[in-house]
UniProtKB/Swiss-Prot annotation:
Any GO molecular function: holo-citrate lyase synthase activity
Family the UniProt entry places it in: Belongs to the CitX family.
Organism expressing this protein natively: Escherichia coli O127:H6 (strain E2348/69 / EPEC)
Biological function: Transfers 2-(5''-triphosphoribosyl)-3'-dephosphocoenzyme-A on a serine residue to the apo-acyl carrier protein (gamma chain) of the citrate lyase to yield holo-acyl carrier protein.
The UniProt record lists the keyword Nucleotidyltransferase: yes
InterPro entries: CitX (IPR005551)
Its EC number(s): 2.7.7.61
Keyword terms of this UniProt record: Nucleotidyltransferase, Transferase
Major enzyme class: transferase
Gene this protein is translated from: citX
An example Gene Ontology biological process: prosthetic group biosynthetic process
Domain of life according to the entry: Bacteria
Catalytic activity line of the entry: apo-[citrate lyase ACP] + 2'-(5''-triphospho-alpha-D-ribosyl)-3'-dephospho-CoA = holo-[citrate lyase ACP] + diphosphate
Name of the protein in its database record: Probable apo-citrate lyase phosphoribosyl-dephospho-CoA transferase
Length: 183
């Protein structure tokens, strides 16, 4: 289910392309839920800027896939189907996992908090009925910025940081994980 980093497109995505990609992801999610009446993990990489498919985002994605599969194995949860693809919004993974949706969401939240690359992952859990379990459902604060302790959304809206600084931080986190062989 991994993606080859060397095949990244480096396409600068437009806002309309991004919106279409998100609509297509939602349609894929609903199709998966019809095939598998178990919770669905929909996984993407948080990638600032217009280039969503790069060697870096694919490598970050691959670490996330490995971590999600290890989480399922550790918990004894069966992955019924899994797939990886690339859309205009970057690498995307979907895993149908036979587990209680609430337990799955809590475990993925813990994964996002404990893994060194967790801040770069956006892991959604959808119930078999198609409801997205949100961080807010668990009284969790919004995601933090990669460079400061502000809300990531506030920094993004205000363009608080230079894109190059954010991308450099992403790459530094990835290189640290690769150097330590963290999965």
């Amino acid at each position: 289910m991994h993606l080859l980093p060397e095949l990244a497109s480096h396409h600068a995505v437009s806002i309309p392309e991004l919106l279409v990609s998100r609509d297509e992801r939602q349609a894929r999610q609903h199709a998966w839920l019809k095939r598998h009446p178990v919770p669905l993990v929909s996984f993407t990489v948080v990638a600032p800027g217009p280039i969503k498919d790069s060697e870096v985002t694919r490598r970050i994605f691959n670490h996330g896939v490995t971590a999600l599969r290890a989480l399922a194995a550790k918990q004894g949860w069966q992955i019924q189907e899994q797939a990886a693809l690339v859309s205009a919004s970057g690498p995307e993974g979907m895993l149908s996992i036979a587990a209680p949706a609430r337990d799955l969401k809590l475990a993925t939240i813990e994964l996002e908090h404990s893994h060194p690359l967790g801040r770069l992952w956006d892991i959604d859990v959808l119930t078999p009925e198609g409801d997205i379990l949100s961080r807010r459902d668990y009284s969790l604060p919004p995601r933090r910025c990669l460079l400061c302790e502000q809300s990531a959304a506030v920094c993004a809206r205000g363009k608080t940081h230079q894109l190059t600084d954010l991308l450099n931080r992403m790459e530094a986190l990835l290189n640290d994980v690769d150097a330590c062989n963290v999965n």
